[in-house]
């Protein structure tokens, strides 16, 4: 028997409940999220502007950082305004198309960030382990190629999710205990098998774990090269050049790890803890990345002070 209309097959809208169990304090939870959103916007925009306008920062490492800033600006803007709408104005309803759109952009920018972090790890590996080859390997053409690969792989991993969800019937199920839209959050509501969705999701996670493995291997090689240097002063200087990148990786991976860990093994943990950790996963990296690079990278710090505060260094 044919489906009567698309609305019966795909419910017209969903309800994002926010953080279940903490509804009474939603309005107060919104303030720290608003604060970190402002920090993410101002910090990433400032660093992106500085890299774009300062000729001395037109180097591979800073091009990668500019890509990271663009991704962080996009990721935070794709998630936090909707969260604030739920927390402050009780705007919980989102259309089916709106859900798919937000889900697409959240996963797309998350995958892109993972790839850019791999590129930044490769940049540090070449700079420390193969310094004489640095300018020959990491040319502007190679950086453009990395950016293209990041976009194409993200599309390859995320576009199928949209079509995997479009094929599912939801039978009127529309309540989602979350603050933003993600693939399995809606797939679980389907009144049909989601085995294909789960298998594709596991494949995507495997690719992201491969990114993590590449980052770890590059840093093992970096540490080996650093501790082969003749003096402690040279070792500390080399380690300092990697400090910002390691901080960014920890900001990206730590909330994701705890969110994944609690979902897999924390069955007795209250649901609001799961949702809160998932929120940190999309909020913390865009907020901390500009702070980490602004504080730890002397060249960026001095350039920001000179441009925005008219100080001489």
Curated annotation (Swiss-Prot):
Keyword Signal: no
Example GO molecular function: olfactory receptor activity
Assigned keywords, A-Z: Cell membrane, G-protein coupled receptor, Glycoprotein, Membrane, Olfaction, Receptor, Sensory transduction, Transducer, Transmembrane, Transmembrane helix
Protein's cellular compartments: Cell membrane
Transmembrane segments: 28-48, 57-77, 102-122, 142-162, 199-218, 239-259, 275-295
GO cellular component: plasma membrane
Sugar-modified residues: 5
Database matches in PROSITE patterns: G_PROTEIN_RECEP_F1_1, G_PROTEIN_RECEP_F1_2
Coiled-coil ranges per UniProt: none
Domain of life: Eukaryota
Pfam families named in the record: 7tm_4
Function: Odorant receptor.
Assigned protein family: Belongs to the G-protein coupled receptor 1 family.
Full protein name: Olfactory receptor 52E6
Organism: Homo sapiens
Gene: OR52E6
């Amino acid at each position: 028997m044919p489906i009567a209309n698309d609305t019966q097959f795909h419910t017209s809208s969903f309800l994002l409940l926010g953080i279940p169990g903490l509804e009474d304090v939603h309005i107060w939870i919104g303030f720290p999220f608003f604060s970190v959103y402002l920090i993410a916007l101002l910090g990433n925009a400032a660093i992106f502007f500085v890299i774009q306008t300062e000729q001395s920062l037109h180097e591979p490492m800073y091009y990668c950082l500019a890509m990271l800033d663009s991704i962080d600006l996009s990721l935070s803007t794709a998630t936090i305004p909707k969260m604030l709408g739920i927390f402050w104005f009780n705007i919980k309803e989102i259309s089916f198309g709106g859900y798919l759109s937000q889900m697409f952009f959240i996963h797309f920018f998350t995958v892109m960030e993972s790839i850019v972090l791999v590129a930044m790890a490769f940049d540090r590996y070449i700079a420390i382990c193969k310094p004489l080859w640095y300018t020959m390997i990491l040319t502007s053409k190679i950086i453009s190629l990395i950016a293209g690969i990041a976009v194409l792989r993200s599309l390859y991993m995320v576009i199928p999710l949209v079509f995997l969800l479009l094929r599912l019937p939801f039978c009127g199920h529309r309540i989602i205990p979350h603050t933003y839209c993600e693939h399995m959050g809606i797939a679980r509501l389907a009144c049909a098998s989601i085995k294909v969705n789960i298998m594709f999701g596991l494949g995507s996670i495997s690719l992201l774990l491969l990114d993590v493995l590449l980052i770890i291997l590059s840093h093992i090689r970096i540490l080996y090269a650093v501790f082969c240097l003749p003096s402690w002063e040279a070792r500390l200087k080399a380690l300092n050049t990697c400090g910002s990148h390691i901080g960014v990786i920890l900001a990206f991976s730590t909330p994701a790890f705890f969110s994944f860990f609690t979902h897999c093994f924390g069955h007795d943990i209250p649901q609001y803890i799961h949702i809160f950790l998932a929120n940190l996963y999309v909020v913390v990296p865009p907020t901390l990345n500009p702070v980490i690079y602004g504080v730890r990278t002397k060249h960026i710090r001095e350039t920001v002070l000179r441009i925005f505060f008219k100080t001489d260094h």
